[in-house]
Amino acid sequence: MNTSAEGQSPTSPQSVAILGAGAWGSTLAMLAQGQGHRVRVWNRRKGLDLAEVLQGSQILISAVSMAGVRPVVEAVRQVGIPPQAILVSATKGLDPLQLLTPTQIWGATFPEQPLVVLSGPNLSAEIRQGLPAAAVVASRDPWAAVQVQYALSSERFRLYTSSDPLGVELGGTLKNVIAIAVGVCDGLQLGANARAALVTRGLAEMIRVGSKLGARAETFNGLSGLGDLLATCHSRLSRNYRVGYGLGQGQPLSQILAEIEGTAEGVYTAPVVVEIAAQHGIQVPITQEVHLLLQGQTTPTAALTRLMERQLTSE
């Protein structure tokens, strides 16, 4: 994009539309309002007028669940958006129909819009409490990434830019499955050694998948990969970790999901990653065991045994 044509300073007040009023969408709205921006939040269930919310928006942030991405994209397509509006995806998941990331779905419908991925170790409850956090905004359009960086950064929320949107997006998505595995480990009370092994080998698994799909391996060592993985695997605030912990304690998946507010995206990401891995010949043993466990086709103990008894190899 021609940046000079925008005439918009990164520090100028912006008009920000946020799609999704869940925990993350509400947190992003709080961050944007704290920086003096004009913020409008749209929630399908509240019957708000989408056209009114989008009118004049310079930054449009999608913070809906993965299941809501396609319906929201279609709703936005019907209404239309300002031609220079920056589309930001803050969703972590994979589409089970076409095996696409959220940004790929947005890009297919709005190929002319600048696209940005926002991801990182961002437990929304901590951010709402005013605790410090950092994240990454990634785009093939450097100007768009900088616009979003300055729009949301504050003394308590630091944003870095990246030119690898696919890597940033996949890091935030793939780690949800590994977090379930780590939760199972803790639910079984297997100790710090086992947890460290799962996190480390889980990161290697994420890198294998991401690299095969075209992301840069080094991206996964940053905030959106390792950073998000560590936060998600070491906090009871993480829905995915809580799913795994409950399974490790012997609770039925249906009961666990009923007790969790919001969506544990890793539950729905696991089968998609298994399918992608099968298509591309990628080894994802941890994800495979998580998938079997979620489907009720194995037990936590049996899954652990299979992982430990895999053929010995180099790291």
Curated annotation (Swiss-Prot):
Annotated localization: Cytoplasm
Keywords on record: Cytoplasm, Lipid biosynthesis, Lipid metabolism, NAD, NADP, Nucleotide-binding, Oxidoreductase, Phospholipid biosynthesis, Phospholipid metabolism
Family annotation (InterPro entries): 6-PGluconate_DH-like_C_sf (IPR008927), 6PGD_dom2 (IPR013328), G3P_DH_NAD-dep (IPR006168), G3P_DH_NAD-dep_C (IPR006109), G3P_DH_NAD-dep_N (IPR011128), NAD(P)-bd_dom_sf (IPR036291)
Active site per database record: K175
GO molecular function per UniProt: glycerol-3-phosphate dehydrogenase [NAD(P)+] activity; NAD binding
Biological process terms in GO annotation: carbohydrate metabolic process; glycerol-3-phosphate biosynthetic process; glycerol-3-phosphate catabolic process; glycerophospholipid metabolic process; phospholipid biosynthetic process
SUPFAM superfamilies: 6-phosphogluconate dehydrogenase C-terminal domain-like, NAD(P)-binding Rossmann-fold domains
GO CC aspect terms: cytosol
Keyword Transmembrane applies: no
Binding-site positions, NADPH: W24, R44, R45, K92, S124, R239, E265
Catalytic activity: sn-glycerol 3-phosphate + NAD(+) = dihydroxyacetone phosphate + NADH + H(+); sn-glycerol 3-phosphate + NADP(+) = dihydroxyacetone phosphate + NADPH + H(+)
Pathway annotation: Membrane lipid metabolism; glycerophospholipid metabolism
Broad class of the protein's primary localization: cytoplasm
Gene3D superfamilies: N-(1-d-carboxylethyl)-l-norvaline Dehydrogenase, domain 2 (1.10.1040.10), NAD(P)-binding Rossmann-like Domain (3.40.50.720)
Pfam families: NAD_Gly3P_dh_C, NAD_Gly3P_dh_N
Binding site for sn-glycerol 3-phosphate: K92, G120, K175, D228, S238, R239, N240
Function recorded in the entry: Catalyzes the reduction of the glycolytic intermediate dihydroxyacetone phosphate (DHAP) to sn-glycerol 3-phosphate (G3P), the key precursor for phospholipid synthesis.
Family membership: Belongs to the NAD-dependent glycerol-3-phosphate dehydrogenase family.
HAMAP family per UniProt: NAD_Glyc3P_dehydrog
Listed name of the protein: Glycerol-3-phosphate dehydrogenase [NAD(P)+]
Gene designation: gpsA
